[in-house]
Amino acid sequence: HRDLHSFPTRRSSDLLIQNQYQFIAVKFEESEQYRFEKALAQKPFLPEENEEEEVELANHLQTFGLIKRIESLPEQASKVILGISGGLDSALALLVSHQAMKRLGRDPKDIIAVTMPAQATSKNSNSIAKNLMSKLGVTALEIPIAESVDLHLKSIDHDTKDVTYENAQARMRTLILMDLSNKYGGFVLGTGDLSEIALGWMTYNGDQMSMYAVNAGLPKTWVQRLIRYHADHEYHVLKETLEKILQAPISPELLENQDT
């Protein structure tokens, strides 16, 4: 009761304090030729010095972090299950998973990589995803979701291609991955990066949800740089495919011709 009664008093005090502020108008001249005293980096998160060493260190941190996660699980629940779209984030997550299994002396077939094409999935993205999975020798599954999503949307009487339509696809993919983790004895590896997390560019109960988010500490520029690192080093055999991923427009492909 005391808090409720004191609310008007607090409000009056706040207004009194605001009235005591002194406002000073300051004018600035606008100039198109203005230059900052110090140049602003276009990619501020990437190292300016010892770049190769820093990138190699980032790769080790990702790989050994995932190894630690795998080792903490009972063997019958330690397979890696992840969705592959043919984009930057899922490609990096797959490469890190492959490195982790290799260092653990385990069969790459213990990585279950899943493509889940829908109406807006491009042939190029799907082809890239399949090529990656094939060359890495992982267990590759393709589970189309178009019919499942349509059935779900029909059940809630929704026929508009809007945010509901987009999120339904992301949630359907996560549902499939979670069920596969139970079926095959593993955990869902999240692929989203720090830029997406910071901007909220994800679907709750969709790609936001996983048991271990391997890219969560990396902004998109770092993801791109690490893909380049892998193309030039251990995964040189995948260089052509990884180059295609780097050059492709960034898109969630939840709507036709969608970009970011």
What are these regions (language model features)?
Residues H1, H5-S12:
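Short, small-residue-biased leader/transition segments that mark boundaries at the very start
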Residues S13-G86, S90-T260:
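ATP/NTP-dependent adenylation/nucleotidyl-transfer catalytic domains that generate, transfer
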